[in-house]
Swiss-Prot record:
It is an enzyme of class 5 (isomerase). Mn(2+) 2 binds at D15, S65, D439, H440. The gene is gpmI. InterPro entries: Alkaline_phosphatase_core_sf, BPG-indep_PGM_N, Metalloenzyme, PGAM_B_sf, Pgm_bpd_ind. Its EC number is 5.4.2.12. Pathway: Carbohydrate degradation; glycolysis; pyruvate from D-glyceraldehyde 3-phosphate: step 3/5. The active site is at S65 (phosphoserine intermediate). This is 2,3-bisphosphoglycerate-independent phosphoglycerate mutase. Binds 2 manganese ions per subunit. GO terms for biological process: glucose catabolic process; glycolytic process. It comes from Picosynechococcus sp. (strain ATCC 27264 / PCC 7002 / PR-6) (Agmenellum quadruplicatum). It comes from the Bacteria.
Length: 525
């Protein structure tokens, strides 16, 4: 006799779908969303926190996709690398970090150059300006005179033309302490691609690893010229200001702490089997990354990864249940690597499907992205009737929100709403329960108070909607399930375990978002 189909719990992550009451510059409010509107009107919902200390970041710091998925999968507030590194600088232990001191000492003794690569902003998503300034202080203390900064401009996690101000702050620090020079500039569109668009990465790689062909203008003149022509920080074409190429035996510190957008350039610089584009390997680089970008990278890591145990994926596997993850390229690492606490490998019984993101320069050109294909993959997996947990990410609100184009963001929201209608119907047909939430805000705030396009994330809360399925009811509740207020992302994994009837491990400090029933009820799941 065949086993009955499994009725899953499906976690749907609407990346960048925040909540904001004001309708102005709000793509979500402006969009036609009949499905989400019906969900809010019909099913229990609440708002949860996705920023600041509630997700392991400094107070007031906006959340991001990496942090969001770490907290979602871990079931606890995970102290973030931004805080770890900033605290080390503040308490002085940064200057005693064994890996950082070692690369400085060996670079000085060999008479080589020290290169500092990273995103130059205070966005706090991939890097922080204070960390670069801390590295300049480290170089000064260790007597390194030849220090070259390969600046990556932001314009995505910050205002679009703030780059000139950040570089001026760096230059002021250089002038004050007498160490370092801004040798190259590359927009993050080139240096921090994560979708194997190697033609972009090659342009950044070339300016960092070659000499000659210098732009004689100051960095301020270069950036202002681009701003005047409508080119913002994210898209600044790679340019070389001073001689200072990365050469054999040099020391290199890549100070981004978030891995996903630092991997490709790192592989280009150190991987002997690299095939992204034609280049000769630069031998004997003394290469350090702030955090572990990839376990297979032949580099030293200054801040070793935290070991998270008994996370959601692991608990599901330990209970002999199968799970499925899917997203398109832009968010695939988030539902796999980050959701699994920084583990590259899948758990036993964890299946994955990667959907390719469209090959366009910016996603306002195709706001629907690959949402339909993601929905197809999710529905097919759900209909197999073998998965107890399904995790899906829709990238559209975040990726199109980052373009700052309101009309395109509205189209992105409407695309996702349409897909949700089909997805939730499929889950319902299988008797499953749907949890709809987001990892952080973005698309609900597309322009600042001055009307200038806003391309960064927000600190707004996000929705959490619970749609019970007939064969996956919440245990111990009657007809009405009540969701508590003031929750956070760390509470989602315990909620899933609550619905599945699995005991929460003590390592999970989050609490189920399902409020205790006011009276005892026995109910079939």
């Amino acid at each position: 006799m065949a086993n009955a189909p499994v009725s899953p719990v499906v976690l749907v992550i609407l990346d960048g779908w925040g909540y904001r009451q004001e309708a102005n510059a709000n793509a979500i409010a402006a969009a036609n969303t009949p499905n989400v509107d019906a969900f809010f009107a019909t099913y229990p919902s609440t708002l949860i926190h996705t920023s600041g200390k509630r997700v392991g970041l400094p107070d007031g710091q906006m959340g991001n996709s990496e942090v969001g998925h770490l907290n979602l999968g871990a079931g606890r507030v995970v102290p973030q690398e931004l805080v770890r590194i900033s605290d080390a600088i503040e308490d002085g232990s940064f200057l005693r970090n064994d890996v950082l001191v070692k690369v400085c000492r060996e670079t000085r003794q060999a008479g080589k150059k020290l290169h500092l690569i990273g995103l130059c902003s205070d966005g706090g998503v991939h890097s922080h300006l204070n960390h670069l300034l801390g590295l300049l202080d480290l170089a000064k203390v260790n007597g390194i005179a030849d220090v070259h900064i390969h600046a990556i401009t932001d314009g995505r996690d910050t205002n679009t033309t703030e780059g000139i101000n950040y570089l001026q702050q760096i230059q002021a620090h250089i002038d004050k302490f007498g160490v370092g020079s801004i040798s190259t500039i590359s927009g993050r569109y080139f240096a921090m691609d994560r979708d194997r668009r190697w033609d972009r990465v090659k342009q950044a790689y070339d300016v960092m690893t070659q000499n000659g062909n210098l732009d004689q203008r100051s960095f301020a003149e270069i950036l202002q010229s681009h701003y005047d022509n409508g080119v913002t920080d994210e898209f600044i074409p790679p340019v070389r200001l001073k001689e200072g190429a990365i050469e054999p035996g040099d020391g290199v510190i890549f100070y981004n702490f978030r891995p996903d957008r630092a991997r490709q350039l790192s592989y280009a610089l150190v991987d002997k089997n690299f095939q992204g584009f034609e280049r000769e390997l630069i031998p004997d680089l003394n290469f350090v990354t702030f955090t572990q970008y990839d376990a297979n990278l032949p580099v030293q890591v200054a801040f070793a990864p935290q070991n998270l145990t008994k996370i959601l994926g692991e608990v599901i596997a330990d209970n002999g249940l199968k799970q499925f993850r899917t997203a398109e390229t832009e968010k695939y690492p988030h539902v796999t690597y980050f959701f699994n606490g920084g583990l590259e490998v899948a758990f036993e019984g964890e299946d994955r499907e990667l959907i390719s993101s469209p090959q366009v320069a910016t996603y306002d050109q195709k706001p629907e992205m690959s949402a339909k294909a993601v929905t197809d993959a999710a529905c097919q997996a759900i209909e197999k009737g073998i998965y107890s947990l399904v995790v899906i990410n829709y990238a559209n609100p975040d990726m199109v929100g980052h373009t700052g184009k309101l009309e395109a963001a509205v189209q992105a929201i409407e695309t996702v709403d349409h897909c949700l209608g089909r997805l939730v119907a499929t889950i319902g047909k299988m008797g499953g329960t749907t949890l709809i939430t987001a990892d952080h805000g973005n698309a609900e705030y597309m322009a600042d108070q001055n009307g200038k396009s806003w391309t960064a994330h927000t600190t707004n809360p996000v929705p959490f909607i619970l749609i019970e399925g007939e064969r996956r009811k919440v245990v111990g509740h009657g007809a009405d399930v009540v969701l508590r207020e003031n929750g956070c992302l760390a509470d989602v994994a315990p909620t899933i375990l609550d619905i599945l009837g699995i005991d929460k491990p003590q390592e999970m400090t989050g609490q189920s978002l399902i409020a205790p029933a006011p009276y005892a009820v026995t109910r079939r799941r």
